[in-house]
Amino acid sequence: MESQQLHQNPHSLHGSAYASVTSKEVSSNQDPLAVSASNLPEFDRDSTKVNSQQETTPGTSAVPENHHHVSPQPASVPPPQNGQYQQHGMMTPNKAMASNWAHYQQPSMMTCSHYQTSPAYYQPDPHYPLPQYIPPLSTSSPDPIDSQDQHSEVPQAKTKVRNNVLPPHTLTSEENFYTWVKFYIRFLKNSNLGDIIPNDQGEIKRQMTYEEHAYIYNTFQAFAPFHLLPTWVKQILEINYADILTVLCKSVSKMQTNNQELKDWIALANLEYDGSTSADTFEITVSTIIQRLKENNINVSDRLACQLILKGLSGDFKYLRNQYRTKTNMKLSQLFAEIQLIYDENKIMNLNKPSQYKQHSEYKNVSRTSPNTTNTKVTTRNYHRTNSSKPRAAKAHNIATSSKFSRVNNDHINESTVSSQYLSDDNELSLGQQQKESKPTHTIDSNDELPDHLLIDSGASQTLVRSAHYLHHATPNSEINIVDAQKQDIPINAIGNLHFNFQNGTKTSIKALHTPNIAYDLLSLSELANQNITACFTRNTLERSDGTVLAPIVKHGDFYWLSKKYLIPSHISKLTINNVNKSKSVNKYPYPLIHRMLGHANFRSIQKSLKKNAVTYLKESDIEWSNASTYQCPDCLIGKSTKHRHVKGSRLKYQESYEPFQYLHTDIFGPVHHLPKSAPSYFISFTDEKTRFQWVYPLHDRREESILNVFTSILAFIKNQFNARVLVIQMDRGSEYTNKTLHKFFTNRGITACYTTTADSRAHGVAERLNRTLLNDCRTLLHCSGLPNHLWFSAVEFSTIIRNSLVSPKNDKSARQHAGLAGLDITTILPFGQPVIVNNHNPDSKIHPRGIPGYALHPSRNSYGYIIYLPSLKKTVDTTNYVILQDNQSKLDQFNYDTLTFDDDLNRLTAHNQSFIEQNETEQSYDQNTESDHDYQSEIEINSDPLVNDFSSQSMNPLQLDHEPVQKVRALKEVDADISEYNILPSPVRSRTPHIINKESTEMGGTIESDTTSPRHSSTFTARNQKRPGSPNDMIDLTSQDRVNYELENIKTTRLGGTEEPYIQRNSDTNIKYRTTNSTPSIDDRSPDSDSTTPIISIETKAACDNTPSIDTDPPEYRSSDHATPNIMPDKSSKNVTADSILDDLPLPDLTNKSPTDTSDVSKDIPHIHSRQTNSSLGGMDDSNVLTTTKSKKRSLEDNETEIEVSRDTWNNKNMRSLEPPRSKKRINLIAAIKGVKSIKPVRTTLRYDEAITYNEDNKEKDRYIEAYHKEINQLLRMNTWDTNKYYDRNDIDPKKVINSMFIFNKKRDGTHKARFVARGDIQHPDTYDSDMQSNTVHHYALMTSLSIALDNDYYITQLDISSAYLYADIKEELYIRPPPHLGLNDKLLRLRKSLYGLKQSGANWYETIKSYLINCCDMQEVRGWSCVFKNSQVTICLFVDDMILFSKDLNANEKIITTLKKQYDTKIINLGESDNEIQYDILGLEIKYQRSKYMKLGMEKSLTEKLPKLNVPLNPKGKKLSAPGQPGHYIDQDELEIDEDEYKEKVHEMQKLIGLASYVGYKFRFDLLYYINTLAQHILFPSRQVLDMTYELIQFMWDTRDKQLIWHKNKPTKPDNKLVAISDASYGNQPYYKSQIGNIFLLNGKVIGGKSTKASLTCTSTTEAEIHAVSEAIPLLNNLSHLVQELNKKPIIKGLLTDSRSTISIIKSTNEEKFRNRFFGTKAMRLRDEVSGNNLYVYYIETKKNIADVMTKPLPIKTFKLLTNKWIH
């Protein structure tokens, strides 16, 4: 039957997965594997070995089963899943027999997929799919697929069948894949498929047929199990499961690459060089090999490459081995230069050598210069070869006198070594430096030298030594001239005597010459003969004429040597030898001064510029150049730090043919962020190709018009000033250059626009390098001067002026000289940022000072004046009326510049600038210290509690951790916004005021979170895109910025005042980022609940959904294009859900008796807007909800710079009793302060070691802390926190791996004293932890939801605590800590084993540890999108670090979990919750009263009663209670606040404490206070009397209502569904900058579980738009809570949304889109429609008077406030 089907359908070709090809094997000209000839025998042996393991049954062609081959059982081939091979059809044994499957017995059940499209093949005809089983392959030369598509017949030509093709073995591991591919390709070749296998280039000889394709696919699948394939193969097959040939092609290419790598390594290891080929050829060969390895991700270090090269050097190059033997920092380029120089010298000497020496020379002279890091050292090597193998015996002493040369003026030295070698003393000129260098002629092999010995030379008429150390009575040489045997001069530096003291006490002295230009010290026998001393070479001794032995001589190599131990050292000064007159350096300008004045240019440029007279009025001889080449400027090191240089030679050669100013290079840099609007954000630079003249122009944007104006200006300038026309401008392909406007501009003026090629920025090297240079200078100048960042372009302009005036290393002239301009007048230049006093020609009063402090920037372009920055006026002026401020204290304070106080030198250079100011302005130092417990004295008695280790007590010197800062104000500067990490500018080093960033929102209790644009500062969580949030990263210490900031993030705390995030930021390991001032964080196990915990607050502009867990809420199918209008009300069960059912059981006010004075709906009126905006903390601009007029009106606001100005010249106009200026005042602008609120510092709640123990005068408390200390030590040792077997030396450990540690102490609410040993994670190096690890705690919404569900379902609530939780988590990194202070081991370290509290990774390690245990051992699952919420069928767990809250219907289920936890962790039961009566809990700061099946009350009465009185706020001053936290109509005055510096810090600190505590309380349960908390939090930096009074009023209201509780009652048991409702409201335009306030309240089954009040992130233009914004912010969190409720309680859920804006509901329900005013409004409304419809959300109207969310958006009258809150807070 099957054969008939095949005959009827010739297109359905069949193939077998195991069948042999019955055709002639196709030969291949090139092996695609490129296997070398040496590897082929091994390959054949492996193949033969495999073949030998398979036995062939006689009489058949079948191959029996073997272990290399797929088992015939069906289970041997794993079923495809998760991207494995697709399985369309299975081959059964019967089908296999029917299809002539004879060769491999019965195969396993094989898959046979339909053909899919592949890059190398054609798509088959869909009418003829592949069959479900494949017959044997029978064609040898089938037609390609093309012919089959034309319905042609399959060729029937048959060739000889190969019946015994051995299959490849089965792939056994991923590592053996490439070896298996070799066998598999050999198998395909033997199966006559070699011509369709692609080579490494992807080329094939012919197209395959369907039959061959199926054959290859099935055999590959059979012998290569999917799970054993490499990842890259799986990725290919997941895209196209049948694309086997692509896999083979890439495998061949990778194997060829591996083969080439092996060849390159072999070639590199076997390098040899003897000079027979050119050095350039050798260098190219080696560099090519190294480059190929680098392209294959194999980096060969310079040291390894040099070692391999040195190993292969021979001949004259062999000496380099000894030279580099001791070097550790070998450079490959340096070694190549050495080899090249030796090669060139040999080549020259071979050409110059006389013919009689070319054949019979005994000497080969090689000279080589060796670079050195300190000085230049020239070493000459003379390789001496004798014709005799015998040692060279010294001649008799009388032979030396037969020299043909005069001993006085023309002494002859034989076999000497000559070259120039300088002394190592950097402070003195070297010996012989004025002598000419002789050409080396004769050396001895360096291997023959005997250290610390003199070579005895019978042919030398003079004794020569290299060191003056042994030279007595030395005098500088002025007349003696020595030559060697080749009559080459040897420079002599000094003449003296060598004093010998031989072993029998004989002393003698001989004349000696000093020269450093020889390789060895030579001792002349002739000189010894003059002292009656001879050398006996038979007995190897020095003897007197009477036979007395004076000293032994040593034979070493071919020569005899005398030890230098018989020489008497001299004690002469090198000054007497050098004879250098150093008096010339007197009155010279120090080089660091010139370096600063000339814009921190490099040494060579400055020196060359002075030589070429590019700088006038200053000569090269006027500068002290000693050590100038090695001078390291700290500012240059910081400002000019770079990764790598641009590639040299990237510029094309033909560009050099242009004339000056005909060829320009241009590029744009920017933007620079966080600058005032007046400061440019970009600059565009131009460089002339010929002269290298540079121009820079500032830009505020990159618009076409701005760029065009600059080009017009530069072309006109060049034409008029230099009489030249620009022909070509080279640019990159940025859109600012490639636009039509600029292209037309170039075309009209005949200018050629030359663009770089795609992705070839290196071709634009001239402009790129200029930008890099200018930015290096900019960073350096700003860092050196300490000027604010908005002056960055002034630094660039100053750098341009200097660079145009200096000679570059590649040019002989400066750019100005090339352009025909005069050199730079040095008298017109001041150091950038030089303090000056500017004359004020128009003072406000005749008695005011006439001088204004300023800072010099750069010479003016438009006048002969100077551009000077005046911080007090916040502007720059162009003036000549200035004088340099001569004040040593006004110099740089970043470094200790002993040589940079150049008042006298600067006066000489700028004498004409001195005029009218002579006073100095004194300054004080500014310090910052960071210390730990190890600086304090330990008073712990070791006998109080036995410890595991033998700890010894050691006292330490007590130091005070906190030092009161002394403010140092160098000048009056404005404060710029913080520069992002991508900015080029450094932070101002002297900024004494907080950096301000706009952060403006509070969420659920006044959450104030960072909202920076930098990724590392991101702290928001968007539910729609699932961004994980982070805690604020950069908190400002407004009270004491100069104190130590700690960021002990792993101490378990909670953010107070704001929606607690379910995830922590990327760089942290816990949910809190502490950076405390003057303190360390709380260490209470439930520190958020600690009695003295003060919250961290941060202002944010994100919406509520940004801080809630993200749930996948993608819309369902209805969002397809055929659904034009979404349904507002869901279809299912909509008939059962009504507005009444949604409103039922909600705690809404009862309005049956409406009061005539009720003003709860006043917010819907539209009063007239006042012309003057009044920013109110309690109600906005005019009324409780002020709206703009109906007519559109443009609103313009003054640009208020976000700064806090320090004004020194502000006079007290109210009191003129004294003409003395008052103390420094802070002038605070309201809008700037509101925009500047970024974070609030937590108040320290813990004690340091010295406070708790060392200096604690309360002996009882001290004893308790000591007891807690020992308890903590024992716990640490019991948990094996560190390695107790070994102490490590600090000097042996990488400092990055060392973490400082300290003890912190705290008193918990229950009265117990707690000690905690923590690591200083705030100073932990980033390389020591993984920033991607997440540390999570339960979200407060999740806790409230769980509590609500527990009440409705009568759950038991069990509270647990795990002691020392972090110490159960192992640490992966290698970290070390300092031992506890009582051990006294300050110089030792301990190796950490566990995740110590304080480490950045500890929280993440603990989270992963406990999560894994709960999932694997307790059968729990984490709820998706809600971290730290775990559940199974019976129990729900909320995890907050080491606190666990268990909810279950069955108490036994809780106890089962507890039993499992106790097996692994020290678990304490805080409250089992078994009682049926009222149970009191203290859960994460909430005081909860719970009676199952009845009610639950949440409050904080005890905590507030204890904490509020400690805030130093007068409570109940008038003896009556407040009824509301604030009243409408109270506005904050906009007048600037002028306040003393110290008073300002004190008041800001007070605001931090008050608002912080209020935010914490509001976040937990007092949602009715959120609006007031949020608004006051925005005024933390504006602590006026009015703001403080309003804050006191809020605290007073909290005190009066401290007994209020959030009351929940059990839901009616008749309700079959869970009902989740969000109530939304917005107050339009009642915040600064016309921002709107939005608020939402969330209720589950009628119980309020959360609330949010925040300023809208966008400026809304109408009331409706504000309401839409509020609704859109509520929906994501509503959806996420819905998912959580459904996970925790399987009942159906109804979601409702209530708003008092009928227009918003109308827009959601309307199908008319023409009413939308603009695209933004329309897209937001349409998105809202989709979200409402797609999430089964019911939207209903609620009366304004019943809208309890009204309290979140505006201040309300007392009656209205009570009416809206008394049903849920009472």
Curated annotation (Swiss-Prot):
Ranges where the Integrase catalytic domain occurs: 656-831
Enzyme Commission designation: 3.4.23.-, 2.7.7.49, 2.7.7.7, 3.1.26.4
Name of this protein: Transposon Ty2-B Gag-Pol polyprotein
PROSITE patterns: INTEGRASE
Origin species: Saccharomyces cerevisiae (strain ATCC 204508 / S288c) (Baker's yeast)
Binding site for Mg(2+) 1: 667, 732
Subcellular location: Cytoplasm; Nucleus
Function: Capsid protein (CA) is the structural component of the virus-like particle (VLP), forming the shell that encapsulates the retrotransposons dimeric RNA genome. The particles are assembled from trimer-clustered units and there are holes in the capsid shells that allow for the diffusion of macromolecules. CA also has nucleocapsid-like chaperone activity, promoting primer tRNA(i)-Met annealing to the multipartite primer-binding site (PBS), dimerization of Ty2 RNA and initiation of reverse transcription.
A Pfam family annotated for this UniProt entry: Pol_BBD
Gene: TY2B-B
Note: Retrotransposons are mobile genetic entities that are able to replicate via an RNA intermediate and a reverse transcription step. In contrast to retroviruses, retrotransposons are non-infectious, lack an envelope and remain intracellular. Ty2 retrotransposons belong to the copia elements (pseudoviridae).
